[in-house]
């Protein structure tokens, strides 16, 4: 497995600063957030080559089909605009040769489950077609059940696989976010029996302190992260472990990019033995 760091973990730095710091820390790959990319893709690719980084997975500028309920990340309200943006991101991000490009459903936000599901299935089919045209793997990310009203109405591995089955999209993978799925009973069976469906891994831990909504480095919480790494290794899965830390301003996000990258590498390296 390769080791990667997702750019949201160093939200206050630029793409160029991320690339330099992640490479200097010893990461193999970067998890790109499209909103951080400068417009010149050729220059961006040259910078990645210069520093020897590959791309783990990409998060599109508009990552959900239905509008997010996270303050500051809502984006357009119209699902049609969101789907068109998601398809455009597939075409742009293909140049970076990522392991996958992810999407989430978004929350229902007052829609009936049937109405929301119909919109999402249409969006997934169109995004998958756009991904197929440029040889990109689309990955659907479930979110933890506590984020049903803000992030996604797909809150388990079973939900995600059922949605993809209903959409007729068996080629679409799953983005396994350990923070979201560490307590899903189906996690271990997915890794052991169907690791080929895992198109990417986001890696963070669930804090030990009750009431916290941020994430901590792998190995610092209660999320059985070492067991996940061992299970992935046993299954033969060989993608990137992409450390992804959503933080509070005075916690992990307060670190300078170089220090954040070093801390993240030390944490994930300790689990990959």
Regions found by a protein language model. Name each.
Residues 1-26, 88-91, 97-99, 159-172, ...:
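Histidine-acidic metal/acid-base catalytic patches
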Residues 5, 29-34, 175-177:
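Short catalytic-loop micro-motif centered on adjacent basic/acidic residues
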Residues 9, 34-36, 61-64, 105-109, ...:
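Active-site-proximal loop/turn and secondary-structure-junction residues that shape catalytic pockets
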Residues 21, 25-39, 59, 64:
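N-terminal substrate-binding region of glycoside hydrolase catalytic domains
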Residues 31, 57-59, 102, 139, ...:
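Conserved beta-strand positions in the central sheet of alpha/beta enzyme cores
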Residues 31-51, 105, 111-112, 148:
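Glycine-rich, proline-tolerant flexible connector loops at the mouths of alpha/beta enzymes
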Residues 64-74, 109-113, 145-150, 209-215, ...:
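A short acidic, helix-capping loop that chelates divalent metal ions and anchors anionic groups
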Residues 74-173, 183:
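Active-site acidic/histidine proton-transfer and metal-coordination neighborhood
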